[in-house]
């Protein structure tokens, strides 16, 4: 789809009280990209934060060519100023986000305008719906942005046959059902005399709302469910039928499809026309009927309204922070407003679960003697990338015996946690020698460096900072990796049994004082050679650290939101092999049977995490490792027991993922315990026995159980906690964890890693 837009001129932007900075930033970016000047009128209650946000953006824009004064704020709160601007001949367009009064004033100005009014989003759960998915989606949506985002669900209309089952699932996932008396007390304290919601209630937590209303709720309550009458006349008169920008969700029992759709229509008629609605059903006829009846610009089918309406995650709608409500809501468009179109359009968007993948190197050779495969590759000139230790102990000379008459050049400057400068030096070496193959022999750092060297050699225009930008889906991101065929072959030969880098599309590098992770299948080696004899010289500590790294890969891939039957098979096998063979390899480095099993297990775990990816344990290990120089495998081992128990508990926030329709991490841990014959009559027992087995392994291979044990200074660590939490939060590994780690939870995990063993 191609959209063409021309500058309008001077745009007057009205900002709401509930989203003053995000709306200001979004409108500023759209205005700047379409070469429009923006004048903003913020809410009087949010003028300072909006003004500061726009000031920062204007300054940043000027550094790259934005004309001065393109983005301006007039914070004077008086209505006379607004009226003056509404009718000023120099204002070409008005873009309003706000309540009914702001929309009416905009429409009365007599200028071209876009109005985004209040939302009052209904969601209809049909008896054919996937109830577990519906509950997780609604909780994701209703708790998004402190519950103040206007497309979030406000009233849930539930088919009577599944009403009790759905409420039970809500309760299990952390919502609390209020009694009629509690609903009455809540209304008494949060509804103003004119029937509107008191400002003090907006964006409050469940506990704070309970305190305001004088009711009791459990400490972990995510959303309060308020039963509303089924009778449509009584429902229309209820004060909680309106938009509730707080974690309060009305629930209505519906006796029929007709009643359910009528109830949803009634919700939209209470200042929600044109905005957003959702329906959960497996019956396309039901979603079609819903779409034909409900007058909203966004109709989400089997997707959460808040995250889904914003576009780009659960569907292919245009990403936005400004939602058109069409003529129903006093606007000129129903689009997700960005830079285009003057039409009212109903966008019926179905949840999209994109196809998954399983991508591996073209050839993988394993077991003793696999280095002989180098003879079959017909290499004329090779650059061997390695580290000083591997070169000193003769591993490069060992390679030469299999390369025949090939010219061999050696780049041995790679250090642990390779820095960008080392990668650039390697690129210079590639330019000097112009080989037809790069052979990266060493640990994970060497192989990661080799991947990055080939990438920047073949595509010198790429920039590390852009390639490392965060993303949710590798197919929908800002940074573009090259798609052309490689000009040189990359051969990965691991000398440790742990990283799995030989089969992974990731490269972890150090840029400045932080770790960055490049992830793309263009980084995948062409050939992986797993020669177990190369691991025989690993010291005990390296054997333990790298083996625990592989175990973490397998366990995190097993519960990733991208896990699949393909990756599960590899993850399960890797866990089994590591639990069985790592203690043997640790105790007796000459035990080649155990060494071979561990070399293969590390690669098998690599095949799992290369396609399912990892989670919060790796994010924490990357952050702590970069800051305090703790080895990656050791840091993983310290955090792993805490992360296992964290992921097995009820999430405070679910990870949005179209293919991940129910929270199954606890079940999968129990399944792993059952498959390995650890016993247990219940899922909880099987889970706990798996966790105990992991603890036993960590003790057996002498992994320190706390950061204090490895010598991290307590005062320095405590001072670094905010920085570490931020680094972990920005780490790409975190985006495939089965639950969203909140900052406070990351801090808890970081403190637990310092304190030691879980209780």
Annotate each language-model stretch with its function:
Residues 25, 30-34, 103-234:
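ALDH superfamily catalytic-core signature
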Residues 503-612:
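Carboxylate- and glycine-rich phosphate/diphosphate-binding segment that chelates Mg2+/Mn2+
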Residues 627-719, 759:
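Gly/Pro-rich interdomain helix-loop hinge
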Residues 2-133:
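Rossmann-like NAD(P) dinucleotide-binding subdomain of oxidoreductase/dehydrogenase enzymes
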């Amino acid at each position: 789809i191609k959209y063409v837009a021309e500058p309008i001129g001077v745009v007057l932007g009205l900002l709401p009280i509930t989203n003053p900075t995000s709306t200001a930033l979004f409108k500023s970016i759209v205005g700047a990209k379409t070469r429009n000047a923006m004048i903003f009128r913020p809410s009087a209650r949010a003028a300072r934060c909006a003004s500061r946000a726009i000031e920062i953006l204007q300054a940043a824009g000027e550094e790259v060519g934005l004309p001065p004064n393109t983005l301006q704020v007039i914070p004077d709160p008086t209505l006379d100023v607004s009226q003056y601007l509404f009718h000023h001949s120099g204002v070409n367009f008005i873009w309003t986000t706000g309540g009914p009064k702001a929309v009416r004033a905009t429409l009365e100005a007599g200028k071209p305008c876009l109005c985004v009014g209040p939302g009052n989003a209904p969601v209809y759960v049909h008896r054919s719906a996937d109830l577990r998915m519906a509950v997780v989606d609604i909780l994701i949506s209703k708790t998004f942005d402190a519950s103040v985002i206007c497309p979030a669900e406000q009233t849930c209309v539930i088919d009577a046959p599944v009403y009790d089952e759905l409420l039970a699932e809500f309760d299990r996932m952390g919502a609390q059902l209020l009694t009629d008396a509690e609903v009455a007390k809540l209304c008494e304290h949060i509804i103003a005399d004119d029937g509107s919601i008191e400002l003090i209630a907006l964006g409050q937590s469940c506990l704070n709302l309970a305190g305001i209303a004088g009711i009791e709720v459990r400490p972990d309550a995510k959303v309060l469910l308020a039963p509303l009458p089924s009778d449509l006349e009584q429902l229309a008169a209820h004060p909680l039928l309106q938009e509730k920008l707080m974690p309060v969700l009305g629930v209505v029992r519906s006796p029929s499809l007709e009643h359910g759709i009528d109830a949803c229509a009634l919700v939209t008629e209470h200042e929600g026309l044109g905005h957003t609605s959702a329906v959960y059903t497996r019956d396309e006829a039901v979603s079609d009927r819903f779409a034909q009846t409900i007058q909203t610009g966004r109709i989400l089918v089997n997707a959460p309204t808040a995250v889904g309406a914003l576009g780009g995650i659960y569907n292919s709608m245009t990403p936005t922070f400004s939602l058109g409500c069409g003529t129903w809501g006093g606007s000129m468009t129903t689009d997700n407003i960005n830079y285009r179109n003057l039409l009212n359009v109903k966008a019926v968007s179905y949840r999209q679960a994109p196809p998954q993948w399983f991508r591996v190197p073209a050839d993988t050779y394993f077991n003793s003697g696999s280095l002989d495969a180098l003879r079959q590759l017909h290499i004329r000139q090779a650059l061997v990338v390695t580290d000083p230790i591997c070169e000193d102990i003769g591993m490069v000379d060992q390679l030469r015996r299999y390369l025949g008459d090939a010219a061999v050049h050696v780049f041995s400057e790679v250090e642990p946690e390779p820095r960008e400068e080392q990668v650039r030096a390697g690129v210079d070496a590639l330019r000097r020698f112009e080989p037809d193959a790069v052979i990266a022999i060493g640990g994970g750092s060497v192989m990661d460096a080799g991947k990055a060297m080939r990438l920047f050699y073949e595509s010198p225009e790429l920039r590390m900072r852009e390639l490392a930008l965060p993303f949710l889906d590798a197919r929908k991101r800002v940074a573009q990796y090259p798609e052309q065929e490689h000009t040189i072959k990359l051969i990965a030969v691991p000398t440790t049994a742990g990283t799995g880098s030989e089969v992974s599309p990731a490269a972890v590098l150090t840029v400045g004082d932080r770790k960055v992770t490049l992830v793309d299948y263009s980084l995948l080696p062409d050939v992986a050679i797993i020669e177990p004899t190369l691991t025989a010289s690993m010291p005990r500590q390296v054997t333990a650290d790298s083996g625990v790294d592989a175990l973490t890969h397998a366990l995190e891939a097993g519960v990733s939101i991208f896990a699949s039957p393909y990756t599960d098979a590899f993850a399960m096998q890797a866990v089994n092999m590591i639990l069985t063979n790592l203690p043997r390899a640790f105790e007796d480095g000459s035990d080649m049977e155990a060494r071979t099993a561990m070399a293969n297990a590390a690669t098998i775990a690599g095949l799992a995490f290369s396609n399912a990816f990892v989670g919060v344990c790796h994010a924490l290990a990357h952050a702590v490792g970069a800051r305090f120089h703790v080895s990656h495998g050791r840091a993983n081992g310290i955090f792993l027991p805490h992360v296992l128990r964290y992921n097995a508990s009820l999430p405070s926030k679910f990870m949005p993922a179209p293919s991940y329709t129910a929270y199954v991490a606890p079940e999968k841990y129990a399944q792993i315990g059952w498959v390995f014959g650890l016993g247990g009559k219940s899922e909880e027992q099987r889970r706990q026995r798996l966790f105990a087995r992991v603890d036993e392994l960590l003790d057996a291979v002498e992994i320190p159980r706390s950061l204090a044990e490895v010598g991290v200074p307590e005062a320095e660590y405590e001072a670094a906690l905010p920085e570490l939490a931020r680094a972990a939060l920005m780490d790409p590994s975190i985006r495939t964890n089965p639950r969203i780690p909140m900052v406070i939870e990351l801090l808890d995990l970081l403190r637990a890693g310092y304190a030691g063993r879980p209780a």
